[in-house]
Amino acid sequence: ADLGWHGVDGDRRLAFRRLDDRSGFPWLTASKLPELVRFAPRRRGTADPGSLPTHVRTPEGEELTVFGKELATEVGRRHGSPVEMVHLNRGIFDEASISVITSSTVGEIGRLAAQRPDVRRFRPNILIASTRSIPFEEDEWVGGVLSFGEANESAAVCITNRDERCSMVSFDPDSARPDAEVLKAIVRVRDNQAGVYGAVTRRGRLTIGLPVFFEPAAADRRRQ
């Protein structure tokens, strides 16, 4: 995936807008319609990997065009009021355009919740398998920079703050069934925070298996 100034290319560039909503936040999210997590984007043909999906697969397996009337009608029927698909050039994010979590953190939360949670519950852009294998290691990265790959001009992300979790981690990504144990575990041991947010400081290409390097904040380097 290509990492640009506004995050991973294509990430959160599509959203359903509730046509009857006047709240100032018209977007339909899975917190309002949990079944949304079971809709999956698909890209047909030979489009560029960073381009928008061409279709969306419904929970029943039917593939509908992204901007077609059939998809909007189906989602609106489940929601109970009309919606339309909107293309957002820069995306819409909760806190920041990049979210990062380690596999050790996901595993520890699962242990605390007596489950094996799917990492998709946490919706990270970047999942890191740290050689330290320390749960919640990400907390130490705030203020520092992660770079991806060994080249001097490799992609880089400045870690800005910890990720405060919401009810989204409670939904099973395959069934959409809610289970509060994962969120309860995060609240109990980490003050409802797991993973970190970041901002892109250098654009580049991200691929599976890239080595990741951490550079602490300047103040931290002076203390070392």
Which positions does each model-derived feature cover?
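A conserved acidic, glycine/proline-rich C-terminal tail/linker
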Residues: 166-203
